[in-house]
């Protein structure tokens, strides 16, 4: 701490000195000269490094006077100045390996400041390496395992030694202790690092020597030489190259004739020098007559021979049995067992349980005493010699203690989860002839420890939950079992911390820590995510607690919560309806347009079907159930109205199903000139001024009364003429001549409908001028038609163009519909305050304006029956490309229903047949005459 404070003070003094020099303009000289020294590492503190006063050209006494001191940064000061001798000395022990690791050159740099000159001198001290480190292995012992039958020449890698020194002082060589089986080979890597390998020179014999002890020595090249060692233990694995050998070639035993069945007579033992399965010996009888085979039982694993039937001395007093021993590799050995049957004995042993230590914990070490037994037999000599035994499958064994006491000790590890208590039977048998025995029974309880973690019934779980579920709803239940008891088996459930789309999992799911029931904390949305992955942890309450995890996959099921969305025709913001063009010559099945819709749901909830919900002319059009294609169901007739209104419904297959509707307007005409001609055939009131309205009404009533008869005659003549021309047109095949094929809508799906042109006809409420709007193209949203034309081409109607006229019923004039009037913002020209939409353009020359005025004013008288249906809007009319450029479906204002004739009760309806509940008369875009007008 003191050194740190000194360095901090020196740093502050130096910083202040530098600032002072800068303030007074004193020049700062640095790096004028570099002074170099070289010292070996591990010098003692105060060792001489160099004469700094001499190298600086100063006397030793001037060092203090001139304020000469060492300036260093960020490192513990390794050197200091001796002001009396003027020499540079070490400030402490210098360890090159600590400073520079194994770098080839180790240099310590710092500066010396002469304060009165404000001058810095660079000092560079090279620390040279000495051989102060011996090579060292990471471990003191190394185990190498080699199979007994490995061929000579096999190589085995050995660990490398580490020497932090460099150059000749670093690791140079390896040596192996002398032996007759192995040699050492030293290899070098690409970076020059040497590593040793153990090479087998001669074959091994595990039975001769199972473990070979070798010493590997690593040496450096320093002076003095240093080295490090590691003990290498080579364990030889066994191969089956030895046959079993009995401990005795012949076994003899004498037994009383009254021995009980199951009494063990003797145990034969054969040994095999091999290990593992090669050394496991099994026993069997060989060449034993059937009569003798029933008398004895041989344990094939232990070699124990027991009585399986009562012996009879009078029947047979001697048995000669041949036993065969076989190892796992089919090597055999045989031995003889000679059994002599004898007589005598009358007292049974007495067995007493002196002490019982119950319960015993299941983690008790082997050899723990659980009971102390005392045995006694009143007989003498051999008949009074008592032996105790227990069943072989029990994890206990009996050990003889002093005098006649036995200890029952743990022989194999206990597991309370497998057996929680043992009913132990101890049998005491004397050595009489026949032997007598006594049994003692007692119960030993095993106490539990927390040695088993909770286990789930499945490796992983998955469950399903419908979306839009109620908050707090139960989702699923997981169950874990712990075979321990009491608090060691009390399970606590929890969820592992995780995030879903940046939100903690705990905000979506919670779990009951006692029951394992999972609850939804919020309503899930299938469209947000389909699946949740989580980890459930089950921990017991033991000390220390144990736990286990299981993965749970929660799948969100889709519900029909999204209605279909209409993509085409798109609904514009101004409330207009798209208009499609169907030529009069269209055959049945002609593709008029296509309704395109999508559903955000999935599966069956997203399957869409289309149907025609409503049509102004039933039976004229049909909608594809699965494609949404609107096609003609029959050939178009002359009586079919110019404007057809269709309502198409799109419905999904969810439960309950959701639907959406779209209204389509179809103009029945062959081309734009024909549509405009039909519009031009309407007549409009001659005057909209209201100042002389009363006079005009009187004149109008008188005029109507006078010309009524003449009108009827002219109308009949005109109808006859139209009927005559209609017959001529039908005879000519109804073909359209002189019109390019590119002037019609394509039938290749939605793309064709997007490559059409729309037109607007707007009538103002305050002006008698009519305008034909040619919307500007929106090249960002639409496709460009291959056939284009000039937007400013004049639109002309031939004077001699004549159209057949259908019978037009006389309908009473309906009052105006107030909600069809234009707002002030929608009125074009000088009548309105502004244009309602900047996507359309008004006529830009006097000719266009006057022509359209004349056409619309001429048709005003026919507006009352609502059959004038020419309109535009957000959809397309599918008209010829020569009358306007391509434009976006959604960006065209819709004025087709917003028609109001000033000074008149005449209005235009939105769809044919919607006005006053009467069906309109229409046909082939023909000119129509209005009926008799009503007075206000």
From Swiss-Prot:
Query: Which parts of the chain does the record assign to the membrane side Cytoplasmic?
Result: 718-936
User: Which terms under GO biological process does the entry name?
Assistant: cell adhesion; homophilic cell adhesion via plasma membrane adhesion molecules; nervous system development
Give the membrane topology, semicolon-separated if more than one.
Single-pass type I membrane protein
Is Transferase tagged as a keyword?
Answer: no
Q: Which InterPro entries match?
A: Cadherin-like_dom, Cadherin-like_sf, Cadherin_C, Cadherin_CBD, Cadherin_CS, Cadherin_N, Protocadherin/Cadherin-CA
- Signal peptide limits: 1-32
Q: Which residues form the Cadherin domain?
A: 33-137, 138-246, 247-351, 352-456, 457-566, 574-687
Localization terms from the record: Cell membrane
User: Which parts of the sequence are annotated with region: Disordered?
Assistant: 806-845, 906-936
- Protein name, please? Protocadherin gamma-A10
The record lists the organism as: Homo sapiens (Human)
């Amino acid at each position: 701490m003191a050194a740190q404070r000194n360095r901090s003070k020196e740093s502050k003094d130096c910083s202040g000195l530098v600032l002072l020099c800068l303030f007074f303009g004193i020049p700062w000289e640095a790096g004028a000269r570099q002074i170099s020294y070289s010292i070996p590492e591990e010098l003692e503190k105060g060792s001489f490094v160099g004469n700094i006063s001499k190298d600086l050209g100063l006397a030793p006494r001037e060092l203090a006077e001139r304020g000469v001191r060492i300036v260093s940064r960020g490192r513990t000061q390794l050197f200091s100045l001796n002001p009396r001798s003027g020499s540079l000395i070490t400030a402490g022990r210098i360890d090159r390996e600590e400073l520079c690791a194994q770098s080839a050159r180790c240099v310590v740099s710092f500066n010396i400041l002469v304060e009165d000159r404000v001058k810095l001198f660079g000092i560079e001290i090279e620390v040279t390496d000495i051989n102060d480190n011996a090579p060292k292995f990471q471990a003191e012992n190394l185990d190498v395992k080699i199979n007994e039958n490995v061929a000579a020449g096999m190589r085995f890698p050995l660990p490398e030694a580490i020497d932090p020194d460099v150059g000749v002082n670093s690791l140079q060589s390896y040596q192996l202790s002398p032996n007759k089986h192995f040699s050492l080979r030293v290899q070098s890597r690409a970076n020059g690092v040497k590593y040793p390998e153990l090479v087998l020179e001669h074959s091994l014999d595990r039975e001769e020597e199972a473990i070979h002890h070798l010493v590997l020595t690593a040496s450096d090249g320093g002076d003095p030489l240093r080295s490090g060692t590691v003990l290498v233990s080579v364990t030889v694995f066994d191969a089956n190259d030895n046959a079993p050998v009995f401990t005795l070639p012949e076994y003899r035993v004498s037994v009383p004739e009254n021995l009980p069945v199951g009494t063990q007579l003797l145990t034969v033992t054969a040994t095999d020098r091999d290990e593992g399965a090669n050394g496991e010996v099994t026993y069997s009888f060989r060449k034993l007559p059937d009569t003798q085979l029933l008398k004895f039982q041989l344990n094939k694993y232990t070699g124990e021979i027991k009585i399986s039937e009562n012996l009879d001395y009078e029947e047979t007093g001697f048995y000669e049995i041949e036993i065969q021993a076989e190892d796992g590799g089919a090597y055999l050995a045989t031995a003889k067992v000679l059994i002599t049957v004898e007589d005598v004995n009358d007292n049974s042993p007495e067995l007493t349980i002196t002490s019982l230590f119950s319960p015993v914990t299941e983690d008790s070490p082997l050899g723990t005493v659980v009971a102390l037994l005392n045995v006694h037999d009143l007989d003498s000599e051999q008949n009074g010699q008592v032996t105790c035994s227990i069943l072989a499958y029990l994890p206990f064994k009996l050990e003889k203690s002093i005098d006649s006491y036995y200890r029952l000790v743990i022989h194999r590890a206990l597991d309370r989860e497998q057996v929680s208590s043992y009913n132990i039977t101890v049998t005491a048998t004397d050595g009489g002839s026949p032997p007598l025995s006594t049994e003692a029974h007692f119960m030993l309880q095993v106490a539990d420890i927390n040695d088993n973690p909770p286990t789930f019934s499945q490796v992983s779980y998955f469950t399903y939950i419908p979306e839009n579920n109620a908050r707090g709803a139960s989702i699923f239940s997981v169950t874990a079992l712990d075979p321990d008891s009491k608090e060691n088996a009390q399970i606590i459930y929890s969820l592992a911390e995780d995030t879903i789309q940046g939100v903690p999992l705990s905000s979506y799911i919670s779990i009951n820590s006692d029951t394992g029931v999972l609850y939804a904390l919020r309503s899930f949305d299938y469209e947000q995510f389909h699946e949740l992955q989580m980890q459930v942890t089950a921990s017991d309450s033991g000390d220390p607690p144990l736990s286990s995890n299981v993965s749970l996959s929660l799948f969100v099921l889709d519900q029909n919560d999204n209605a279909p969305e209409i993509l085409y025709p798109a609904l514009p913001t101004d409330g207009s309806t798209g208009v499609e063009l169907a030529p009069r010559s269209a055959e049945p099945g002609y593709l008029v347009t296509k309704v395109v819709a999508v559903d955000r749901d999935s599966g069956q909830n997203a399957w869409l079907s289309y149907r025609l919900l409503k049509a102004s002319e039933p039976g004229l059009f049909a909608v594809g159930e699965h494609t949404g294609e609107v096609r003609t169901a029959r050939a178009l007739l002359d009586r079919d109205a110019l404007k057809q209104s269709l309502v198409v419904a799109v419905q999904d297959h969810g439960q309950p199903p959701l639907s959406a509707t779209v209204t389509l307007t179809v103009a029945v005409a062959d081309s734009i000139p024909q549509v405009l001609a039909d519009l031009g055939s309407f007549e409009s009131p001659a005057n909209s001024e209201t100042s002389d309205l009363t006079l005009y009404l009187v004149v109008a009533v008188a005029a109507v009364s006078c010309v009524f008869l003449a009108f009827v005659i002219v109308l009949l003549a005109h109808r006859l003429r139209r009927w005559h021309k209609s017959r001529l047109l039908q005879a000519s095949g109804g073909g359209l001549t002189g019109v390019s094929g590119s002037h019609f809508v394509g039938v290749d799906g939605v793309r064709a409908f997007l490559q059409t042109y729309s037109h607007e006809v707007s009538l103002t409420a305050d002006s008698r001028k009519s305008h034909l709007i040619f919307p500007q193209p929106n090249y960002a949203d639409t496709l460009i038609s291959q056939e284009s034309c000039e937007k400013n081409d004049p639109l002309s109607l031939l004077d001699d163009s004549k159209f057949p006229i259908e019978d037009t019923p006389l309908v009473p004039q309906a009052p105006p519909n107030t909600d069809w009037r234009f707002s002030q913002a929608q009125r074009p020209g000088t009548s309105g305050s502004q244009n309602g939409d900047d996507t359309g353009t008004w006529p830009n020359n006097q000719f266009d304006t006057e022509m359209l005025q004349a056409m619309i004013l001429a048709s005003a008288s026919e507006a009352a029956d609502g059959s004038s249906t020419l309109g535009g809007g957000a959809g397309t009319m599918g008209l010829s490309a020569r009358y306007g450029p391509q434009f976006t479906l959604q960006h065209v204002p819709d004025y087709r229903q917003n028609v109001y004739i000033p000074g008149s009760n005449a209005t235009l309806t939105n769809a044919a047949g919607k006005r006053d509940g009467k069906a309109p008369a229409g046909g082939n875009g023909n000119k129509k005459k209005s009926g008799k007008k009503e007075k206000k």
